[in-house]
Amino acid sequence: MMQPSIKPADEHSAADIIARIGSLTRMLRDSLRELGLDRAIAEAAEAIPDARDRLDYVVQMTAQAAERALNSVEASQPHQEEMEKGAKSLSQRWDAWFDDPIELAQARELVTDTRRFLAEVPDHTRFTNAQLLDIMMAQDFQDLTGQVIKRMMDVIQEIERQLLMVLLENIPEQDARPKRENESLLNGPQVDTSKAGVVASQDQVDDLLDSLGF
């Protein structure tokens, strides 16, 4: 049989190609609509950008919370170090005084320094408490991101359920097909997970897709 010769593309051949592509596209769309796949694909296409935006939101909230916590820790460290340094210095000076009591003038200076240190402690602790509160408040992102992630999981599970239903409703007849252990799953997913043949786990979904050749 003679093979048709390939001619250079001209305006007529280009128009013919475009027309054929249009016909194929229309046939594909009609077939998808007849099978009920157009709705599932449209929902999946809409869910993908939405899921991406939600994941970006989770990432941003997590990064902001981590940055707030780190900033609060860094701001608190100098105050903690100053209190630690002052307490150690005064403790050493008081130990030395008890070992060898010094003159009254030097004792007054030690007492004055101690009183000054004690007066500054509330300011340091107040600042540190404020930073700790900010760290705690930064963790409120978990509630928001948890809701977002749960919503995403609901959308994904719904898309999976609809696509699975489309497959189950359009399975071609195969009388010679070997009997499988999960044959009853071809009747479609059931809601009551206590019954036999219920698609109740991801493993069962995978087995069902394998049995369909996907």
Swiss-Prot record:
It is an enzyme of class 3 (hydrolase). Keywords: Chemotaxis, Cytoplasm, Flagellar rotation, Hydrolase, Protein phosphatase. InterPro entries: Chemotax_Pase_CheZ (IPR007439), CheZ_family_phosphatases (IPR050992). Residues 184-193 have a biased composition (Polar residues). It comes from the Bacteria. Residues 176-199 are annotated as: Disordered. The keyword Iron does not apply. It is found in: Cytoplasm. SUPFAM superfamilies: Chemotaxis phosphatase CheZ. The record marks Q147 as: Enhances dephosphorylation of CheY-P. Pfam families: CheZ. One of its GO terms (molecular function) is phosphoprotein phosphatase activity. Homodimer. Plays an important role in bacterial chemotaxis signal transduction pathway by accelerating the dephosphorylation of phosphorylated CheY (CheY-P). This is Protein phosphatase CheZ.
